[in-house]
Amino acid sequence: MVENSYVLFARLCVELFHELPPLPSDESHGDITTFERLFLRKCRIELENASPKTEHLPLVYVDETNYYRFIKTVRVLAEVYKNSKITETTRKSMIQVLMNPILPPERITDAMNLFRSIIGKLADFHFSDEKFNQLVRSSRVVELEGNYNEEVKLRKEAEDALAMKKEDVEMMEQLLESYKEEQGKLQLQAKALEHKLEAELRHRKETETLLAIERDRIEKVKIQLETVENEIDNTRLKAEEFERKYEGEMILRRESEIALEKEKKELEEVKLKLETYEREQENLSSEVRTWQDKYEQESSLRKLSEYALSREQEELQIVKGLLEFYNGEADAMREERDKALKTAKEQMEKRQPPSSFFCPITQEVMKDPHFAADGFTYEAESIRKWLSTGHQTSPMTNLRLSHLTLVPNRALRSAIEELV
């Protein structure tokens, strides 16, 4: 019986090798758990615990051939486990041989239930040599019948393929005829496209001519634009030159004032303040003109300072000569000088700064005047505070400022420093 069981298991192993897929294992080592391993373990547990027999088999749709194979496998397993005709090691080896799929995945659960329900009944079945040989012969007949059915199926598929091939040949002939007609149409279309291409080439030549004329015009405009840019650069250089001249005049003016103060030691309390300019230009036409005006003003101031210095030197020489010859008249001259100083101080106290010295926001004399985009001059701290609070309009005109850049008004600042 054991030898016949080995033969049957070997045949079933070959026939059922690709029938059932392996199941992923939940174990840490990652081995594949097969369906046979699962239901054989269930079979052993049921037989050892003498589970109750199931009367009715579940309704499971299984292919007839696979179903008979399944029943044969179950019967042999039941006989082996019940009678214990082989050792535990041999049974484990047989189980390892049978660790291959039998049914599709969707039928795994039903097949397991079917096996568990019938394993108790089939375990009581006793095989005789005649019945076992008949079982083997019937399995061989089923195998031959399956092979014959497979051959018939393949022959039918070959005949269908031949019929489809004939249809494809007829279709290719029809396509060839239609291709010839299409070729004639394409030749006509090619001639039409050739005429269209010639017209397109003529149009392209005309377009290229117009494009060349337009390029010449663009080149002329570029030359004009470069000329304008050069003029702007020259104007900017002139502005920088006038600014440098203005700064040089300021340095010369300070040197002249220092020299004047040295020459007038005896008259140092008398300060003749010359008002250079007291007006404010609300709208500057250009930066070049502004610096040019400042340069001319500073030049005139320097000339006046030099003239005043020379006059003071002459007067000082005359005074020194008179002091040498007229000691008596020196006291009178000193009294007259004191009176002149007193009169000058009174005039300076009565004199009020011009309105251009006051900030339109704070209404106080400015210390750091700056130009804004609206053309007005403001105290730097006040106008920055106005802009930082979110205002983008002029405090004087209430119009939107074109930009928020502030420019120092150096000329006005110098005039304020001289007067105050």
From Swiss-Prot:
The gene is PUB58. It comes from Arabidopsis thaliana (Mouse-ear cress). Pfam families: U-box. Gene3D superfamilies: Zinc/RING finger domain, C3HC4 (zinc finger). InterPro entries: ARM-type_fold, Ubox_domain, WD-SAM-U-box, Znf_RING/FYVE/PHD. One of its GO terms (molecular function) is ubiquitin-protein transferase activity. Functions as an E3 ubiquitin ligase. This is Putative U-box domain-containing protein 58. Residues 352-420 form the U-box domain. Pathway: Protein modification; protein ubiquitination. Residues 4-168 form the MIF4G domain. One of its GO terms (biological process) is protein ubiquitination. Keywords: Coiled coil, Transferase, Ubl conjugation pathway. It catalyses: S-ubiquitinyl-[E2 ubiquitin-conjugating enzyme]-L-cysteine + [acceptor protein]-L-lysine = [E2 ubiquitin-conjugating enzyme]-L-cysteine + N(6)-ubiquitinyl-[acceptor protein]-L-lysine. Residues 139-352 form a coiled coil. Its EC number is 2.3.2.27.
